């Protein structure tokens, strides 16, 4: 049965900074407490003037218009939002200036925006992850293998990395990584996800793969769930991107609504094309669909043999930037059967290609603790 991930407060470690709610209006207080609960946090509710210490340390300050006057003398700080009570009261804008509020909000119209703003404050969101979609120009082009290798290479560098299996008919990327028995959620568990998904909760819920300490993989299982709704793909990818680092999505050639959503959230797409005439013709049709959703589409050429088409001609014919040529990986078929993750062998064609590509698109992303171990 599909189970949506819901946000809740993290356990263990230091207590995260909590939002501060300042209002004596009971309906407004109840509404704000419900929104905070949906964002995974338990705010402090104060009905009078707040202590200065709480004002300064709160992750976000939500001030009801009925308490704006009580707070006007507090020191200026970022993250103050004023909740208006009367749409016809023009004085709320004057009080917002006196308070130093960043925004004036009216509920319920601003509820979705406020939910995201609270969750961002609680999670401490930084720059979003670079998101790369990988898909094949024809069947069997090796897109899934390249997607796994990109994620493995990033994890070996200590980057926070999330690999997302966007192909429900691909058999499961966890098998390619040798992690099909690893405990954790798969796509059928998340098919009901809607709205805001906590990035921290998602990272904890996904399988932790042996030897790949910073790599989390959201894979399909071997069940009979045919697809996930685009809303679930949107929510899960948004959560994965909020943590920074790299997100890699393996996208099917036939773009269902969820795959289309994955492309729209990506920064770059890599189209893997064997250097064969029919493969290039097929890739041209795939590329037309991809370009409708994403501007930065690059071709990765796989030479099938000495008589294949030159890579630069393929790129020119597809009207794409050439990301590079991916030579055959010796022993790859045996490695995959034995559960050896693609790209794990340093110095191999996969690792070299992925390293060069990551140097180009992620030149300044810092590593996190815990790489390959």
Language-model regions: role of each:
Residues 232-337:
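Conserved catalytic-core segment of NTP-binding enzymes
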Residues 166-245, 332-338, 342-344:
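P-loop/Walker-type NTP enzyme "switch/lid" segment
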């Amino acid at each position: 049965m599909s189970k949506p991930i819901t946000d809740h407060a993290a356990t263990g470690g230091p207590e995260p900074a909590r939002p501060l709610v300042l209002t004596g209006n009971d309906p407004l207080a109840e509404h704000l407490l419900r929104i905070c609960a949906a964002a995974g946090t338990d705010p402090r509710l104060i009905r009078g003037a707040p202590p200065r210490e709480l004002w300064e340390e709160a992750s976000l300050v939500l001030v009801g218009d009925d308490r704006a006057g009580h707070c006007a003398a507090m020191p200026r700080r970022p993250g103050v939002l004023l909740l208006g009570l009367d749409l016809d009261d023009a004085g709320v804008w004057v009080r917002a200036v006196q308070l130093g509020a960043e925004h004036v909000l009216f509920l319920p119209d601003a509820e979705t925006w406020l939910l995201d703003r609270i969750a961002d404050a609680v999670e401490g969101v930084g720059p979003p992850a670079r998101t790369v979609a990988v898909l094949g120009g024809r069947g069997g082009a090796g897109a899934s293998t390249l997607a796994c290798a990109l994620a493995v290479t990033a994890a070996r560098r200590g980057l926070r990395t999330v690999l997302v299996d966007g192909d429900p008919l691909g058999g499961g990327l966890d098998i390619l990584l040798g992690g099909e028995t690893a405990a954790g959620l798969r796509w059928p568990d998340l098919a009901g996800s809607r709205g805001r998904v906590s990035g921290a909760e998602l990272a904890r819920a996904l399988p932790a793969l042996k030897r790949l300490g910073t790599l989390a993989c959201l894979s399909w299982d071997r069940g009979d769930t045919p697809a996930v709704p685009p809303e679930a793909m949107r929510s899960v990818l948004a959560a994965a991107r909020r943590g920074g680092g790299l997100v890699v999505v393996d996208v099917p050639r036939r773009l269902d609504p969820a795959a289309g959503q994955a492309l729209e959230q990506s920064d770059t797409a890599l189209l893997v094309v064997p250097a064969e005439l029919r493969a290039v013709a097929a890739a041209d049709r795939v590329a037309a669909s991809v370009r409708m959703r994403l501007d930065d589409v690059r071709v990765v050429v796989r030479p099938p043999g000495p008589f294949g088409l030159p890579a630069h001609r393929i790129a020119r014919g597809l009207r794409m930037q050439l990301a590079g040529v991916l030579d055959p990986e010796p022993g790859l078929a045996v490695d995959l059967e034995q559960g050896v993750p693609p790209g794990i062998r340093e110095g191999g064609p996969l690792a070299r290609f992925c390293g060069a590509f990551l140097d180009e698109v992620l030149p300044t992303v810092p590593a996190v603790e815990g790489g390959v171990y």
